[in-house]
C-alpha cells in the first residue's frame, strides 16, 4: 500500500492509481500523479519518501510528465554546498490528463475497428 506523507493512501487515491493503471499508465506514473495532485509542490526525494517509489522510478515518471508538459520544475537552492533541489508541481489539471488518455484510447480503438472492418471485407 502507498503512503503519502506517512499516511496510508486514501481509498479514493488508491482507486485513482488503479484506474490510471488500467488505462495503460505505469504504476510509477500513476502514483506520482496521484501524489502531486494532493500537494502544491514536491521534490523528487519527497515524492520517493511519500510514495515508496525508488529514485529511478520517480525520474522516469517525471520525464514522461515533462514530455507531456504536465509539470513545472524549478530549482531551490539548498543550504551549504551542493546542487539545487528540483521542485516539481503538477500544472495540468487532472481532468486534462484523463482527457489525454481518453483520446489515446479512442484513437487506438478506431484503428482496431478499421482493421476489423478490413478483415470483414477480405473475408467476403
Locate each region found by the language model:
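Short amphipathic alpha-helical elements of helix-turn-helix/winged-helix folds
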Residues: 34-39
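Key DNA-contact positions within bacterial/archaeal DNA-binding proteins
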Residues: 56-57
Amino acid at each position: 500500500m502507498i503512503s503519502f506523507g506517512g499516511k496510508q493512501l486514501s481509498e479514493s487515491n488508491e482507486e485513482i492509481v488503479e484506474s490510471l493503471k488500467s488505462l495503460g499508465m505505469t504504476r510509477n506514473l500513476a502514483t506520482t500523479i496521484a501524489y502531486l495532485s494532493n500537494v502544491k509542490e514536491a521534490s523528487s526525494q519527497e515524492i520517493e519518501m511519500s510514495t515508496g517509489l525508488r529514485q529511478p522510478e520517480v525520474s522516469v515518471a517525471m520525464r514522461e510528465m515533462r514530455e507531456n508538459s504536465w509539470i513545472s520544475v524549478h530549482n531551490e537552492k539548498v543550504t551549504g554546498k551542493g546542487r539545487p533541489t528540483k521542485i516539481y508541481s503538477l500544472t495540468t489539471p487532472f481532468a486534462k490528463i484523463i482527457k489525454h488518455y481518453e483520446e489515446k484510447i479512442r484513437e487506438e480503438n478506431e484503428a482496431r475497428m478499421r482493421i476489423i472492418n478490413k478483415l470483414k471485407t477480405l473475408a467476403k
